[in-house]
Every structure is written in C-alpha cells, then in structure tokens.
C-alpha cells in the first residue's frame, strides 16, 4: 500500500479563515477552517491547498469545480453534499460523515477515508486511484462504471453496496463485510475473499444452500 499523505499541514503555520467568506474562483492556501456550520452553501471554482477542515458542518451543499490538494478533513459532516466535477489529491477524511454524498465523475487520487461514515455514497463514473477505506462504512454505496486502481478496503462495511461495470479484480475484500453486495460475476472475478464470504456470492451462480 503506497498512498501518499497530505503534505505540509502543520497547524501552527495555518491561518484561521471562515468558509462563509470564501469568494468564487478564490484560491485558498495554508488555511485552517474550524467549528463552522455552513449548510446549503454553494462553492464554485475554488482551489484549497494545504488546508485543514476541523469540525465543519456543511450538509446539503453544492461544491462545484473545486480542487482539494493536500487537505485534511477531521470530524466534519458533509452529509448529502453534491461534489460536482471536483478533484481530491492527497487528502484524508478522518472520523467524518460523507453519507449520501454525490462524487459522480469526480477524481480522487491518494485519498484515505478513516473511521468515516460513507453510507449511500455515489462514486459512479468517478476516477479513483490509490484509495484507502479503513474502518469505514460504505453500506448501500454505489459504484457504476467507476474507474478504480489500487483500492484498499480494510475492515470496511460494504453491505448492500452496488457495483456495476466496475471490476474488483485483485482487490482484497477478505476482512470487510459484503453481505448483500450487488455485483455481477464478471465484476467480482479475481477479487480476494475468504471462505465465509463465498457463501454470500453463491447467488451469482444460481445455487441455493440447503439448511
């Protein structure tokens, strides 16, 4: 596993700012955003670099054409926010809520989700590379035609997650929960699972287990 972490996010070097004061197309560098509630906000064509977001509540927002680079999100709530044409490069979500977020057609590169609630997340047609989901819940998440490379699930909850035209070849699912996962035989081919998980996938070959 070789996922690059956010670079140079030393809190003593960051200046405190408020999200509510951000202007369209503004570039924000080396800033700390903390203890702010800004639900239903719209952000457009901004670039965040070397920033920290701590205890930010930004639910039901529209975040469009934004680039987050070398940025850390800690204890933030972005539930039901739509990220439209956004890029996340060397970012980390730690103990956050991104449940119901729409990341359709976004680009995620070297991003870690740690102890994060990502239930109902939509990563359809996104490009995700070098991604870690650790101790993270992705229940009923949606991956349709998602371009994936070097994805790691470490104790992830993938119950009832849906994968469509998204290959999991060579991806290790063995220590994650996959009960009720919706996937085709073609997409699951080559994935790494344990013996017990194999039972959850027998429906793909049309057999039933006699009790």
Where are these regions (language model features)?
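Tandem repeat scaffolds
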Residues: 2-211
């Amino acid at each position: 596993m070789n996922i690059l972490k956010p670079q140079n996010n030393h809190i003593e070097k960051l200046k405190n700012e408020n999200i509510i004061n951000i202007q369209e197309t503004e570039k924000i560098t080396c800033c700390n955003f903390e203890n702010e509630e800004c639900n239903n906000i719209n952000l457009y064509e901004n670039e965040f670099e070397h920033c920290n977001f701590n205890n930010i509540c930004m639910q039901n927002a529209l975040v469009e054409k934004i680039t987050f680079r070398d940025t850390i999100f800690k204890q933030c709530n972005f539930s039901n926010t739509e990220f439209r044409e956004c890029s996340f490069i060397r970012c980390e979500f730690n103990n956050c809520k991104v449940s119901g977020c729409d990341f359709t057609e976004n680009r995620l590169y070297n991003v870690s989700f740690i102890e994060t609630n990502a239930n109902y997340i939509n990563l359809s047609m996104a490009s995700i590379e070098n991604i870690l989901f650790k101790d993270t819940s992705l229940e009923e998440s949606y991956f349709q035609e998602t371009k994936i490379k070097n994805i790691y699930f470490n104790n992830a909850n993938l119950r009832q997650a849906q994968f469509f035209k998204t290959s999991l070849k060579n991806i290790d699912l063995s220590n994650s929960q996959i009960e009720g996962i919706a996937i085709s035989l073609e997409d699951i081919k080559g994935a790494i699972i344990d013996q017990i998980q194999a039972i959850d996938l027998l429906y793909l070959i049309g057999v039933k287990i006699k009790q």
